Amino acid sequence: MQRRFMLLSLAVAATLGGSTTLAFAADQTMNVDVCVVGAGAGGMSAGMAAVDAGYNTVILEKLGVIGGGGNFMEGTFAVGSRLQIKDNVGINAEKQFKRVMDFHHWRINGKALNNWLKETATTIDWLEAHGINFEGVHTAFIDGNRTWHMFEGGHGSSLITNFAEKIEAKGGKILTSTPAQSLIIDKDGTVRGVVATNEDGNKLTINAKAVIIATGGFSCNPEMVKKYLPYAGYESAGSPGRTGDGVQMLEKAGAKLVNMNVTMQAGLWLKDVPTELQFGKDGLTGATYVRLLAALFQPYLKVSPKGDRFADETLPLEYISNAAEEIGGEAFAVFDDNTRKEMINVGLPRGYFGMVAPGTKFDNFDKLFAEGVKKGFCYKANSLKELAKLTGMDPKRLQNTVERMNQMTKNQKDDEFYKDSQWLREVKKGPFYAIKGSLRTYATVGGASVNEHFQPLTPEGKVIKGIYAIGQDAGGLYSDSYDMHIAEGTASSWAINGGRLSVEHIKTYLKK
């Protein structure tokens, strides 16, 4: 399985160029055609399309570097693309529309979905015309759909740097460390611009004929996470800076918010361990506990905080995440000394997103696990009763769970959740081990209700003029789960296509 995200230091190094920190000693005013809020994949795509159309364009980025979540994507979704046709991948917009609508039980915006799907192949052509190259079309799943168009080199920072150079070459401005604070809205409810600030706190008023909101959702805002997500303890495993600025501005402008409880789920991670210690600052460096994370990821027994098994442990990330949400967002991997020896001597059967290859021998298990015990996310005991006491589980429930697992393993039949029998393991020989995990998310995917042109809608279905919402600030694409298993790369594609297509509509809007 491919690694889905690089981490920040590599992305920062790749994107320091192509942006300006605007320094001014007093409040200033700027007049533009298009103002884009957010310089991630969606915002940069919008900026590229806007300068291509000849619009005087400014992109605002609150962080000191550009790219956001765009630096972390490895590929993007499309159907019916040139690359898929070349490789005889028989997926088109109609087939994918039916598949996605069925997955979401028709509780999503079908018109917006259909329009986006039909444009994804054209957007791949558009990206290639701008010098963005692809390695091919892949899937991370044995039975997945080949929709994931992998960027050359395996990461999206190439798109960010390429677009930054081209945008500035065509006269567009990219202002870093310049967060948008509020929208300028006239008495009729039409958005007329943005008020931002620079590093020194001085105000920048941007009068714009059209505004595009692309701030990446709210996964880094604990208050919004607690308010909207099923598990209040969700931590972000994705890009920093996603604090819900755009969603909040859209709501204040009158937009209806939809699917606010849905995230791009990252599964179970080591409880209370910083992301960089699990996944590394650049995908490798500093990933001290990545093998323990991979051990947690293995398809062996997982139990609730009470000690009950709660799912087929081989489920895809979005499904196992949903199951974990139902038990409170936290769970334990439980195994015995025989499984420990298997991980050390035979290897980890499942890899972890390119960071740990399948079959890797966990030869430093004892050292890392001992560190985990000291830090409070790993547990070791000579009996199940003692393990239950250490973890806070109910001893009787854990004992019953283990006895049932041992019997199912002996019978080579999971009659509880019907997991493939090759992944059944007895928990019989002490010492016994537990690793505590909690849910994390790469990004939230709920936001403003939009039409097929990415225009925000009020609760009554009225278009809010002068503004567009794209990427993770636009809701309506997902009902209760991110559909990674059938449509890999949709979050980035929704953003990139939203950037291009919103500008296509701006061309019509500004002619009126």
Task: Enumerate the language-model features and the residues they cover.
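N-terminal secretory signal peptides and thylakoid transit peptides that target proteins
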Residues: 1-11
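Conserved N-terminal/central alpha/beta ligand/cofactor-binding core
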Residues: 56, 62-173, 177-179, 302, ...
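An anion/pyrophosphate-binding glycine-rich loop and adjacent beta-alpha core
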Residues: 247-249, 256-390
